[in-house]
Structure formats: structure tokens, C-alpha cells
């Protein structure tokens, strides 16, 4: 186990440790981000955008590594029923991004896309809200939707919001899909919207 910090150069690792990782790692699953829906972009940027920059540097250091990048469907603007597809040009949404988290994920995905165009083997995944494990029921206790459900159960009522859909894709479904896709080089350079 290696403990690092995405917001730091070389993940905050000493040079020897970083070099050893760079020489021995062939595949990177990048799913780290700062998740706080109330923070502005400036507070989310160091870990989400800076961290993505560090992952790209790492993937190019000493030898090329494949990157499986977990983005978010938050890179699409909300508020309507428009279906967004994998091949939508996200540059079309740049001026409609709201919230620091969504803005940072949009920028991070752009960085990954440009790295892919320069030859880095990358596959991108855009999950929606990641929910419980479909078998064990284990869930992130600090996820905002989990907290809303807990609050509703505790107080015995729920918001009246007829158009509010609680979309939660089971974490085990996502993990299985991402690892299966990662095994096939024909998926490099592709984007997958992943909502079950």
C-alpha cells in the first residue's frame, strides 16, 4: 500500500518511491476526486484537476501506462430531460456548468481527452450517483443521497418533488463493468456513460 496525495507533485511521494511505482505500474484506475457539492471550483480544483494532471504525468513517466478514468455524468448540465450521449462534445456545455464539483470534473475530463488525443491509452467512464452494493447493501454512509434517505427515514417524511428521480447505480455493477472494459484495448479512447 502506498499513501499519497493527489494534490501534491509526485502524489507527495519521495522521488525513489514515485520512480519505483512508475517503473512497475502498467495500469492506473483513476477514480479519486474531491466531492463536495457546496464548495466552489477553487476549492475542488487542487485534488480533482491537479490530481488528474498528476495522474497523466505519472502515466507518461518512465513508460506509458493505461489509464481508466472515472469521470461523472455531472459533466453534463442538469435541469432538463435532454439525453446526453457518449459522443456529445462536452465543450458545448462549458458555459452551462454549475457548481465547483461539476466544473472540476468537466476540466479533468478535458485534460484526459487531450492526453488521449496525444496517444495516452485512456478509457473514460461517466457514472451517475454511485449507490449501494446490490448483494451486501453496503453503501457510502456520507453520500448525499444516502444522507437524504436517512434524514427522510428519521423524520418520517420526504420532499414533495415529483420530477426528482433518485438514480443510484450499484457500485458492484460499475466495478464489474469498468474492470471488464479495462481488459480490452479496443476500448481505449472511448467514453462510456454508466447508469443502470
Locate each region found by the language model:
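Conserved Rossmann-fold cofactor-binding substructure of NAD(P)-dependent oxidoreductases
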Residues: 1-27
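Conserved Rossmann-fold NAD(P)-dependent oxidoreductase catalytic core, especially the SDR/UDP-sugar
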Residues: 22-23, 27-32, 38-46, 50-100, ...
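Conserved catalytic Lys-bearing alpha helix of Rossmann-like short-chain dehydrogenase/reductases
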Residues: 49-55, 104-112, 148
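Glycine-rich Rossmann NAD(P)(H)-binding loop
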Residues: 130-135, 160-164, 190-196
Amino acid at each position: 500500500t502506498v499513501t499519497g496525495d493527489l494534490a501534491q507533485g509526485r502524489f507527495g511521494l519521495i522521488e525513489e518511491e514515485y520512480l519505483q511505482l512508475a517503473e512497475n505500474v502498467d495500469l492506473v484506475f483513476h477514480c479519486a476526486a474531491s466531492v463536495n457539492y457546496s464548495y466552489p471550483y477553487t476549492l475542488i480544483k487542487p485534488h480533482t484537476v491537479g490530481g488528474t494532471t498528476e495522474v497523466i504525468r505519472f502515466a507518461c513517466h518512465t513508460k506509458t501506462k493505461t489509464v481508466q478514468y472515472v469521470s461523472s455524468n455531472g459533466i453534463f448540465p442538469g435541469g432538463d430531460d435532454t439525453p446526453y450521449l457518449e459522443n456529445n462534445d462536452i465543450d458545448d456545455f462549458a458555459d452551462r456548468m454549475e457548481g465547483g464539483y461539476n466544473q472540476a470534473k468537466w476540466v479533468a475530463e478535458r485534460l484526459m481527452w487531450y492526453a488521449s488525443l496525444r496517444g495516452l491509452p485512456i478509457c473514460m467512464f461517466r457514472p451517475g450517483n454511485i449507490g449501494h452494493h446490490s448483494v451486501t447493501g453496503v453503501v457510502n454512509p456520507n453520500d448525499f443521497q444516502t444522507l437524504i434517505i436517512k434524514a427522510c427515514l428519521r423524520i418520517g417524511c420526504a420532499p414533495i418533488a415529483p420530477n426528482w428521480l433518485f438514480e443510484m447505480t450499484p457500485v458492484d455493477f460499475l466495478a464489474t463493468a469498468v474492470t471488464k472494459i479495462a481488459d480490452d484495448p479496443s476500448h481505449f479512447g472511448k467514453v462510456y456513460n454508466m447508469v443502470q
